[in-house]
A protein has these predicted regions:
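Short glycine-rich His-centered loop
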Residues: 2-25
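Alpha-helical cap/lid subdomain in secreted, periplasmic
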Residues: 2, 32-46, 61-129
């Protein structure tokens, strides 16, 4: 049976109330439903799902966690939802993160992932209602 390790990373959307002492607890958000879908769609694959999303995280936090919470885990697939905390909480104050810094941090994350896994694919499509 083929094994695939899928890592969910990001902010509160990924955290979704997960238990921090159990990285295999997927909370009550999209990681839980994505895992259920994938298990049903691909029953011949032995998935290991890991959720390390942390509510309130920004791109700079993920950069700080790259080694321990991305590279050392050696995932086959990575799902990242991050960015809203970089802009939402600071839209009206002086701690706003400039676009170029946000972009640089995001590129650091993506490059680290793309160089640490054997296959890379990036989808920037957003859901359409």
């Amino acid at each position: 049976m083929k094994k695939i390790k899928l890592l969910f990373q990001g902010d509160s959307i990924t955290d979704a109330g997960r238990e921090y002492n159990d990285c295999h607890n997927l909370g009550e958000g999209y990681p839980k439903y994505a895992a259920k879908y994938l298990k049903n769609k691909f029953p011949d694959i032995d998935f290991e799902f890991i959720d390390l999303g942390i509510s309130g995280n920004q791109t700079k936090d993920l950069v700080g966690r790259l080694q321990n919470d991305f590279i050392d885990i050696k995932p086959d697939i990575v799902s990242i939802l991050i960015g809203i905390n970089d802009v939402w909480h600071h839209a009206d104050d002086k701690s706003w993160i400039p676009n170029d810094i946000f972009e640089d941090q995001y590129r650091i994350i993506l490059n680290a992932i793309l160089f640490s896994i054997t296959q890379g694919y990036m989808n920037t499509d957003t859901a359409k209602c």
